[in-house]
Amino acid sequence: MEEFQRHIELDRSWQHNLIYPLIFQEYIYAFAYDHGLNKSILLENASDKKYSLLIVKRLITRMYQQNHSILSANDSNQNEIFGHKQKKNLYSQMITEGFSVIVEIPFFPLLISSLEGKEIVKSQNLRSIHSIFPFLEDKFLYLNYVLGILIPYPAHLEISVQTLRYWLKDASSLHLLRFFLYEYRNWNSLITPKEFISFFSKRNQRLFLFLYNFHVCEYESLFVFLRNQSSYLRSXSFGVLLERIYFYGKVKYLGKNFPKDFRVILWFFKXPFLHYVRYQGTILLASKGTSLLIHKWKYYLIYFWQCDFSVWXQPRRIYINRLSNHSLDFMGFLSSVRMNSSVIRSQMSQNSFLIENIIKKFDXIVPIIPLVGSLAKAKFCNVLGPPISKSAWTDLSDSEIIDRFGHICRKVSHXXSGSSRKKSLYRIKYILRLSCARTLSRKHKSTVRAFLKRLGSEFLEEFFTEEEKVLSLTLPRDSSTSWGFYIYRRRIWYLDVICIHNLTNDE
């Protein structure tokens, strides 16, 4: 952020929300490519304060050149591998990465406020993603229905460009954005979600993730506004929602004619508080209301996406869970509300009777099958679970092998510590430990038993049990409960759980 503040000057074009001239700044591409490719191509004859057509012209020219002898010597090995089409995509991707940095600039509140000398407006509705953990612990028990939604992708990326028009008043930049979108694929055809995700992961991640995040942000801002409007007593109805016109008059009428059942009826019309939670591409709408209310919200969301965003939301991507009967798959946990019944025998005078108490308890379980599948995909075990050696790491030093296994083990431990039952977590740790031992024994051409006997079983223990200093959330603990039982049974929410990547990315 400080680098952007130091380089970007508030000139006349910037004051009019024109970001197109920034495309010809060399330092933009240095920021975008401060890792990976050789930056000598980008920084030749660089000037920090002058606009230059040289860099972009050179890259665009190389996209259409068949003779690539002008590349630097450091790129020669890479160029022998790439064909002409790959080279063309490589140079185009370099421009796209630079454009991705530029198009994000108007959406940096801290940067814009510092350049314009304004204070950041604090939104009252802004919530940290870490508020999901208190929601699961405190609110989940008292809810009846949860509406799970997979956010639909735009059927055509032109929809995202049109939405971006309202925020980015720069026609030249929007035309260049369309050029990048049509460069790689014929976007006239509809995109299935699977193809869309696959395209995200292969190239131009930054640009397309920006468009997707902007699409989600725009949807949320409009949806939250409409949701707040629908909660006011005097607001008009929204199609399938309950009618709220002249609600004060209806309340007075109900109070006069139904004095006994007035509270129940008033609660029904007011619509109980609706919790909104989003994690990545999944949305949860949770309510204490009835099945009728949650179904109305389901169809309202379908119409909302179709009418306001021209997005077709498939009904199979929206599911309704009754928490008393089903588990909720969210953030890698199977969350449910478990009923614990206890019978107490009481006696008054000569009469004795039994009192049955039912206590709701939040239960979160980590499914073991997907975790074992991830380990098998990363070659730590086979599909059935038995550990195997990581042959790709046998060329590394012993300390680096142990450090990698320990790093993955700690990350898995952090991700699964919110579970109420730790048995599956201990099984994953066992697989990683034995896989580490098999990898080391394979490197030294020995058996696992002989290797551990020579170094001792405590050799791996200290690396896998050492915890990183990470902030966590825990519930209050009873002083009479032993610490070992507490660690085994209680849930610990590590705040870095949202930053943990897939196991295959740790290679």
UniProtKB/Swiss-Prot annotation:
One Pfam family here: Intron_maturas2
One CC-aspect GO term: chloroplast
Superkingdom of source: Eukaryota
Signal peptide: none
GO molecular function annotation: RNA binding
Cystine pairings recorded for this chain: none
Protein's cellular compartments: Plastid, Chloroplast
Protein's UniProt keywords contain RNA-binding: yes
Main subcellular localisation: plastid
Family according to the record: Belongs to the intron maturase 2 family. MatK subfamily.
Its biological purpose: Usually encoded in the trnK tRNA gene intron. Probably assists in splicing its own and other chloroplast group II introns.
Protein name: Maturase K
Organism: Kali turgidum (Prickly saltwort)
Organism lineage string: Eukaryota, Viridiplantae, Streptophyta, Embryophyta, Tracheophyta
Gene (name only): matK
